[in-house]
């Protein structure tokens, strides 16, 4: 088909586009931590100091250039107001606004005598309260979304692990790989919960505004460093979060490699490659995460290690490589499925049915291979607008609920798992029935439960409500009469309910007026053949002479 021939070019274009967006993805987030904000301000401060040195040598003016903690102010003219755009490196500022500062006629900047600081008007840089409230509600909704999603995924994956681990018939290499994938999803969810608890996720605009208005940001940046030991737990939480995030991506890659090898590799020995898959899933992510932690502790040991500091590519680049490789495996697998469908269509199959089959298979593969990751990577990266909000909701929805979808595909909708659960359920019901005390007149011979009631013999093979009735040729009006010959049969098990089910002696009634006497002979001595009827109401069967 034409589009199959163009598939390699499409794949190459997507990979190229992904590579072009890698730089924007590595050091950008939907939000920014307070540590990241501080680093950006410190970089601007160092650049400002270089500019101030050059201005002292070249320029002239009354008010000296200086760094006030947020903006690098140039030389000011006496008696005039200087304006500078709101700094773009402050995340929660209105980047279209302008900050003002006044140079007095005596050649000094306006001074706040109470706080011993220069004055600047940043009111235009602050976001409007309604916009701030809207952003806060937006992030709260995102938090609720991914918290619910990861919680549901965690619970469903835990049940799936118990089911596969309980049944020995399900213990095989394929399911072992599934179990490792389930565990990686659970660890990813738990690490996110822990990280949210011990690390500050976002920089609130109110916190930044209070620092600026009180003049504390400059002191906070240039002040002495605090005790780093108090951030040990926070650093461990961040490192474990990054490691479990990376292992989850690589176990998704392992699933793709395993499926791809089953399709394309002849005589593929899954047992032989199991330890190799384990090394890829758990070992390789540990290498680059440890390398990142060492680089971070050596070069930029600040706070909780949530900021990029230019070293995020150490772990982000291998993760993006795993996503890209998995996407290539997905395209190749879909190509093979489509080829098989057209081959079977040539034999005379229904084309619509084949397309539906391809669509179902592709949908399952999208969940298994994590194709949504490459889709979100290829989207333009921005932090505002309706499209960004839609993208954030979709991305967090698929990321958090992917574990739930994977558990459905690999466990709950698996035919082998369903068969084992049904067999266990049937055995459990049979064991419950066997432990129950037999009814009145019931006795067990080996594994068969037999009940003798009003001319009725019940066997377990006949069903719960069916009675096989032996009836004498003559009508009987006596009560339930029990034959005790069963005691001598082999395999007899005495029932505790026999004492309550002993037959009561019933006097024989003789009807002299009609000249007939009730027949007290045993059933086996009847002079006429017996008839078998099905009694569905216990001892209410009627006799019909043949």
From Swiss-Prot:
Tissue: Abundantly expressed in brain, arterial and cardiac endothelium. Found as well in sperm, in the head of the epididymis. Lower expression is found in vascular smooth muscle, exocrine pancreas, testis and placenta.
InterPro entries per the UniProt record, alphabetical: GPCR_2, GPCR_2-like_7TM, GPCR_2_extracell_dom_sf, GPCR_2_extracellular_dom, GPCR_2_secretin-like, GPCR_2_secretin-like_CS
Record Gene3D superfamilies: GPCR, family 2, extracellular hormone receptor domain, Rhodopsin 7-helix transmembrane proteins
Sites where a glycan is attached: 51, 106, 116, 121
Oligomer status and interactors: Binds to TIPF39/TIP39.
Family, as annotated: Belongs to the G-protein coupled receptor 2 family.
Name assigned to this protein: Parathyroid hormone 2 receptor
